[in-house]
Amino acid sequence: MKRLKVMTVVGTRPEIIRLSALIQKLEASPSIEHVLVHTGQNYDYELNEVFFKDFNLRRPDFMLNAATGTAIETIGHILIKIDPVLDEVKPDAFLVLGDTNSCLCAIAAKKKRIPIFHMEAGNRCFDQRVPEETNRKIVDHIADINLTYSDIAREYLLREGLPPDRIIKTGSPMLEVLNSRRDDIAKSRILDTLALTPEQYFVVS
């Protein structure tokens, strides 16, 4: 039986964390051949390696090392470097998450008519000065399937004219990520280290 070839692209540490549980499922599925690509948008693999190890992820199949001087140069390098990878791998499906510059590699996949799945689709801040707002709109509108976290994100896409059959509400993958780390969280001594009282603090990022 022919396995479905799925390519997942990451480029930043938040993407690695959010996609970690899904990547593990894709890797474990006997019906899927999973190909992992790291664009190196912000950091090279060595500076991201701790996250791959912490979440029990293998080394990516392709390292694009696309980071360069300006954001525009980085985007250009990402598109140039993903192009031959797509030709070599010929994936059946292409998965990206969020609104980083790395997500714009979906443009190359679209040109090659590879089905695009966009997780965290439909998020909007309604501030055109924010570069990520442009990124997420581009990817939302070229994606074949938009995977939203919430009803309001789905509503935003519908208002922008996307058909309902291209939108699926999945919720956030962070629940699965946190559940997979439950034992490690329970063993953590970070509250003692920071002298914090349980349930008497909050985190701002």
Model-based region annotation:
Residues 32-74:
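Conserved nucleotide-sugar phosphate-binding/catalytic loop shared by glycosyltransferases and other
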Residues 7-10, 16-25, 51, 63-163:
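Active-site and donor-binding regions of nucleotide-sugar-utilizing enzymes
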Residues 1, 29-31, 58-59, 111, ...:
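Short, well-ordered coil/turn elements that cap or connect secondary structure elements
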Residues 8, 36-38, 96, 118, ...:
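Structural beta-sheet core signal
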